[in-house]
Amino acid sequence: MLNSAMSVVILAAGKGTRMYSDLPKVLHTLAGKAMVQHVIDAANELGASQVHLVYGHGGDLLKNTLKNDNLNWVLQAEQLGTGHAMQQAAPFFSDDEDILMLYGDVPLISVETLQRLRDAKPQGGIGLLTVKLDDPSGYGRITRENGKVTGIVEHKDATDEQRQIQEINTGILIANGADMKRWLAKLTNNNAQGEYYITDIIALAYQEGREIAAVHPDRLSEVEGVNNRLQLSRLERVYQSEQAEKLLLAGVMLRDPARFDLRGALTHGRDVEIDTNVIIKGNVTLGHRVKIGAGCVIKNSVIGDDCDISPYSVVEDAHLEAACTIGPFARLRPGAELREGAHVGNFVEMKKARLGKGSKAGHLSYLGDAEIGDNVNIGAGTITCNYDGANKFKTIIGDDVFVGSDTQLVAPVTVGKGATIAAGTTVTRDVADNELVLSRVPQVHKQGWQRPAKKK
């Protein structure tokens, strides 16, 4: 029966010795996000009124990383088992709310499965998430009597007969707050590990005549935990495969689903094509008929209809209007804006710069802190010199300007509409509309010039 209120406890106190890392295990990332953040997000989406995070090792790192989440931090100074961890959180439980127990190193648990578990919890009983494995070695076995769940026996404490059981405990369960506190108070550490097992509450509930409802997840990967980097890498591939499948079924053409990484959220239009080894980070929006070439990285950007991004380009915190062309090997840094039909070619870098409608920067240029008008040509090797060693300054270029190759624009500077900047010019003062500007060392010719001889 579903209570209106529910709190979630996430166990995240483990050190993660087998990760061989200074980083707490639950902060290692899957799809660009800390494992524990996946679990927190699921809890919040499920409607948790409070999320209690039980921590131990690396508390400062955890708190700093998760500072934007509304968490109740619960210290487990000694790691004496899952039951002990829940005992630390128990003082915060309300009697009339449900308590859902999750794990910070089980990142792929789905909201849909958790909702089914919550719905299945009997009044006064326990909802328990279980799975059946061909090889259940090392896992706690589910014991039943006449089909009813009677308890969980940890592998080290199980008899030979019990070790033949294939149904195992995932560790995820839900119960009423008052019941949970009462059962937690009765736990002992009289077992092979000398720890307090949360699983012992199943037998306590059964002895009280309470019902235990077992629910199975849709996919085994939902309940797979991470103890080492190999397991984490496998779950990463599972997750990416699932995301790629969803995108393909929604109409996105992934040329090789096995070589696509989604590390955030992708919103897309129709007939989008994505080549191999593309990485999507953060929140990305792709319009209709967008094409992304091989090896591109797109992060927190909006890309308009009919844009074409050539291979090995990096686009971060940028906004592209329709029909823009990028790359190959272009870099759009935060604050880059391209108006309709603009072109940024190979080895061009933009940062906090706007390139106007139909304007082009074809190759080998740096455009930083700049406002560039419509139908402007930026020649190869153009640099907006925006930094004087202490402060940044802006370059403003009007419509229909032609900037020749190897030009330096020393900001702050404004170039008027229709102006022409000759190749090799260093612009240090404002340029009026329709002016021609050039600054060059006079070209000298010396007939019969002899090169210096090399010393032997």
UniProtKB/Swiss-Prot annotation:
InterPro entries: Bifunctional_GlmU, GlmU-like, GlmU_C_LbH, Hexapep, Hexapep_transf_CS, MobA-like_NTP_Trfase, Nucleotide-diphossugar_trans, Trimer_LpxA-like_sf. GO terms for biological process: cell morphogenesis; cell wall organization; lipid A biosynthetic process; peptidoglycan biosynthetic process; regulation of cell shape; UDP-N-acetylglucosamine biosynthetic process. Binds 1 Mg(2+) ion per subunit. Mg(2+) binds at D105, N227. Residues 1-229 are annotated as: Pyrophosphorylase. The gene is glmU. It comes from Citrobacter koseri (strain ATCC BAA-895 / CDC 4225-83 / SGSC4696). GO terms for cellular component: cytoplasm; membrane. GO terms for molecular function: glucosamine-1-phosphate N-acetyltransferase activity; magnesium ion binding; UDP-N-acetylglucosamine diphosphorylase activity. HAMAP family: GlmU. The keyword S-adenosyl-L-methionine does not apply. It is found in: Cytoplasm. Homotrimer. This is Bifunctional protein GlmU.
